[in-house]
Regions:
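Intrinsically disordered, serine/threonine/proline
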Residues: 1-131, 191, 332, 356-386
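C-terminal cap/substrate-recognition subdomain and adjoining C-terminal extension
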Residues: 199-386
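Asp-based phosphoryl-transfer active-site loop
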Residues: 140-155
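Short, acidic loop-to-helix structural element flanking the phosphoryl-transfer center
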Residues: 167-192, 200-204
Length: 386
């Protein structure tokens, strides 16, 4: 039997809005066999334990290539009282992204109940209850890449792609230096977000990998490959399968539009692709007051950002939204830092002239990858020998 399932759900409460981002799909709902309540509970507990502690293969979530429209009912509670109730409709891929404006009652929201209400007329299916992440001042965010930054993944050949889909992420070397940097900022009160070029169906596998290392993120933002092949919602096009500038900058803007502009922001990435340019594009806009249109006209000519007219308009619109937030808090001081894992042994990186003014916020570091699991290391050595 299948029932709707939340792939991810993020709720962030700041001074002005409750921002919600969610993804929904259909998933098999196994029913334990047995006639005794104890046995049922025991089987269910074993099922949950397996779900939590067994690393999942990315290919196991390939079902997420399918899309469907859903309706989500949100019931918000504040101090035990219901203060908000509304039904929202997803896009054709089951994604939700919306904001709930706050008033005196809603600013104290501390619990959310989530239902799917469209699949069976008259039936509301409870998908879960959630506590929103409350961002108070001063706010601190750390946004980290995943591939080549936290895990030394490889997708260069067909064999490597197949291997990445059919093995847990544990089978790839961990970049221990990157994990240490990320953890150090989390201990200082920074809220972590993950932004990666991995396909959207890697989300459960990535979350497993992070949770095993006690890294609990405020949100995981991946590239939704369904948009590339959609006939209607083409936020991404075939060129974006290999180019990451558009989607990554888009997700960075989404995070700040959900959370508000932080007092301290740290960005982590690598020098294997365009992370330094993408991160500097955001940081320079935050640190220097500029007209969004004039600023974007300079940036979109860079090689890292190649887009069609629709994508151009969408990004410009988000820059204007971010600018409105910045103007509202025009006296706010912002501190920014960018950590970039070296590709080789380079002492500096190439930065476009339009962004060189802010190059000093970048710190390069060596990220030697290590296979922490001995059995995994042996298997990797055998594969190299073959």
């Amino acid at each position: 039997m299948k029932r709707p399932h939340l792939v991810h759900f993020s709720a962030i409460l700041n001074e002005d809005f409750l921002s919600i981002r969610a993804g929904m799909t259909m998933k098999e709902n196994p029913i334990p066999h047995g006639g005794v309540y104890y046995n049922l509970a025991q089987e269910l507990a074993q099922s949950i334990e397996k779900e939590i502690f067994s690393p999942r293969f990315p290919i196991a979530s390939i079902r997420l290539l399918k899309g469907k429209t859903y309706q989500m009912k949100i019931v918000a509670m504040a101090n035990g009282l219901e203060v908000y109730r509304k039904i929202f409709e997803s896009d054709s891929h089951g994604n939700f992204n919306f904001k709930i404006p706050l008033n005196d009652e809603r600013k104290n929201i501390n619990a959310l109940s989530v239902f799917e209400v469209s699949l069976t007329p008259g039936l509301e299916l409870l998908l879960g209850s959630y506590i929103p992440l409350v961002l108070s001042r001063p706010s601190k965010l750390i946004i980290c890449d995943f591939d080549k930054t936290l895990v030394d993944t490889k997708y260069s050949t067909t064999k490597e792609v197949y291997f990445s889909l059919t093995k847990p992420l544990e089978y790839f070397p961990t970049v221990t230096r990157s994990v240490a940097i990320l953890r150090s900022f989390i201990k200082k009160g920074f809220h972590p977000f993950i932004v990666s070029a991995s396909p959207h169906f890697y989300e459960e596998a990535i979350r497993d990998w992070l949770y095993q290392r006690k890294i609990f993120t405020a949100g995981i933002f991946l590239k939704d490959y369904r948009q590339v092949f959609s006939l209607f919602e083409m936020d991404l096009t075939p060129k974006d399968l290999k180019l990451h500038g558009l989607y990554k900058l888009n997700h960075l803007l989404d995070i700040l539009l959900m959370s508000g502009i932080p007092n301290d922001i740290v960005l982590m990435g690598d020098n294997f692709e365009a992370d330094p340019v993408i991160y500097l594009a955001l940081v320079s806009f935050l640190l220097e007051h500029q007209d969004p249109r004039t600023y974007w006209q300079k940036l979109k000519r860079l090689k890292a950002f190649q887009m069609n007219h629709k994508q151009d308009a969408q990004l410009l619109s988000k820059f204007y939204q971010l600018n409105n937030i910045r103007q509202k808090n025009h006296n706010q001081q912002i501190t920014a830092k960018i950590y970039i894992r070296r590709k080789l042994q380079e002492e500096s990186i190439e930065i476009p002239d339009v962004l060189k003014k802010f190059a000093s916020v970048i710190e390069l570091y060596d990220g030697n990858a290590e296979l922490l699991n001995a059995s995994v290391k042996e298997e990797s050595q055998v594969q190299r020998a073959e």
